[in-house]
Amino acid sequence: MLMPKRVKYRREHRGRMKGRAKGGTEVHFGEYGLQALESAWITNRQIEAARRAMTRYMKRGGKVWIKIFPSKPYTAKPLEVRMGSGKGAPEGWVAVVKPGKVMFEVGGVSEEVAREALRLASHKLPIKCKFVKREEIGGEANES
């Protein structure tokens, strides 16, 4: 499971997810990618489930790059506890994903295999996603 080795503070404010992703909006490592169309918190368990779905479908061929990392802790108070008396204990880790962010990349496989692998991965995530191709230098953006 993905999580930071150490953090400066155990608890964080929730924050707001405004606007589009600033960086990581293009396919850099592989030939194909899975791009977010909505903003959400993606947990480390969801990232791992998506990774397993992709690698299981691709078998031994190809390579997968995970371009998001769950660096934000989220907290929860136990059930049936009254309001107040401090913030809850850290429950897990999430990655903040905004629209336009390429979350996963795949390389070394055909387009059909990559499209199906990324489709299976998208079913494990709580947001709408789209399949994107790497932009060739000097060419137009190839998105489908």
UniProtKB/Swiss-Prot annotation:
Complexes and interactors? Part of the 50S ribosomal subunit.
Spell out the GO cellular component terms annotated for this protein, sorted alphabetically and separated by semicolons: cytosolic large ribosomal subunit
Q: Which NCBIfam families match?
A: rplP_bact
Q: What does this protein do?
A: Binds 23S rRNA and is also seen to make contacts with the A and possibly P site tRNAs.
This entry's Gene Ontology molecular function terms read:
rRNA binding; structural constituent of ribosome; tRNA binding
One of the GO biological process terms:
translation
User: Gene3D superfamilies given for it?
Assistant: Ribosomal protein L10e/L16 (3.90.1170.10)
| Keyword flag Oxidoreductase | no
**Which organism is the protein's source?**
Geobacillus sp. (strain WCH70)
What is the protein named?
A: Large ribosomal subunit protein uL16
Query: Origin, by domain of life?
Result: Bacteria
State the encoding gene: rplP
The record's comment on protein family reads: Belongs to the universal ribosomal protein uL16 family.
- HAMAP family (UniProt xref): Ribosomal_uL16
Pfam families reported in the protein's UniProt record: Ribosomal_L16 (PF00252)
